[in-house]
């Protein structure tokens, strides 16, 4: 009995256990299924949310693009004006472009259409036929065609009953009314209307505008749907630019620069920068050789005659050279023009003054750190000099001694104040920088050469900006080329303000330097820069282009008028090889006289009161082959001075003269003979 009860109890307990276990299993399955359903629903909801709210716009766009076709057309690129706002330097004209929708062109029309397009636009027939026969929605045939040709195509399409598949859309093409004028400043555009060089590139975002479009609904194959209209989105034209460049002054600078480069056989060209020192405006920036903006890939120099025979590499080299704006991108040794910076620093620091008689003595050279550095006129030393006389004579030893007194740290602080250790920040593409030794590597000899403008390099724009700092009373002003941006859609005008970066020297020092610069032109090495009726200040410069290259850079920096500076002009000629030599006073200074002689009256700058004392020019006689005594008399009869080596024998025969005979110079100019 006990056993039976036990078995019964055990049996019931087992049944209850199995029942309990089964219940748990069913619950687990139920929970698992509920969890799985929850996860699935959560995932589906998440996916729906992702599709609807996160990727919804993108998917809608993709779906729309699958059954629509866009044809884009360019906006009218902004116009570029000169400083007057009247002369147009760059403008976009209306042309047209041809595209096709291959899926909408009937097979029977393809060959004759390809023949017409290839003949009319001088294209390769096979290439055109290949485009027309593609299974694509749109192909470009040709861009920027004249309207007479597009009208001819329109008439042909009507005559041949081709009503779909060929699109003639409005486009724009860039035109440059003055062809070569300011080519290296303005730059040019590519076939897609994107600026590639100069201002066109620097201000591309402002000039380009926003493209417009024509949208059509299409079927699955890309064909146009009948009875469906087009959606037209108007293009937004680009902004206009008003430059600081004055087209008249630019033309004057380019005219005389070209003449000078050709007459003096400047193998590496030249440039002229004219700047308003009071506000940093670049009034002109001429470079030679230049190029035609309407055909920028072909040179206009003698190289054009052999263009087709040149290799791709040779063509690229020539193009890069003519496109490059050397006035801002290339560095050079400024030579004696840099003595203005040394003199400014020395005067500002109070270690010298302009007219201390016999303060300096030129013995033909000076020894620094065991190295003998000669004066350019070592053969007949200048002797006792004041600072004014030293600048007039361009005497190297005087400026070397000033540099030594200033010391490296102080000298470099003035280089920084004059903006010579960094780029100017001019709003043009491709500005280069200066090349100076690190301050901690400059010893006495290095400082000596820097003091008279050698063994370092700066860009022409840095030099003209530094001298503009002297001319305006001591403020360093950032140069600029664009002064206004005009929004074509709203009419809003944005003024680009002049930016004063800091003070380099005092007004007192500025006046002293300007006074000495005037003496350089009236009595010193810059006599050939004189302009009747105006007070002109300046400094000549000659330096070697590289070390032992045999090439020279000739320059002149000028200020006019010195009593109220409105112009700073820098003329730089690279490797003049003509008979006139390579001295700044004989080659570059006369160009300044020509340019300023036209620019100052154009700007209505008043003449001074000594207009009655007419400055006459005379032709230099030929004294080669004469005795020194005879040459001296001949030059004196022409109101010219002779510059001869010290202790020259009166009976010695002259074998060289600078400038050569026939060159016109002002009376009282020095003629160097050897």
List the predicted regions and their residue ranges.
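Periplasmic/cell-envelope proteins involved in peptidoglycan metabolism and beta-lactam response
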Residues: 1-305, 331, 409-419, 529-530, ...
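Beta-lactam-recognizing serine transpeptidase/beta-lactamase-like catalytic domain environment
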Residues: 7-8, 89-90, 219-230, 278-337, ...
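Short aromatic-glycine motifs in intrinsically disordered, low-complexity regions
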Residues: 68-69, 172-173, 526-527, 541, ...
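Extracytoplasmic
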Residues: 73-78, 92-95, 136, 163, ...
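Structural motif
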Residues: 82-83, 368, 531, 623
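Residues at or immediately flanking beta-strands
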Residues: 165-167, 240, 269-271, 357-359, ...
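Glycine-centered C-terminal helix-capping/turn motifs at helix ends
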Residues: 208, 352-353, 625
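Ligand-recognition elements built from short beta-strands and adjacent flexible loops
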Residues: 533, 571-674
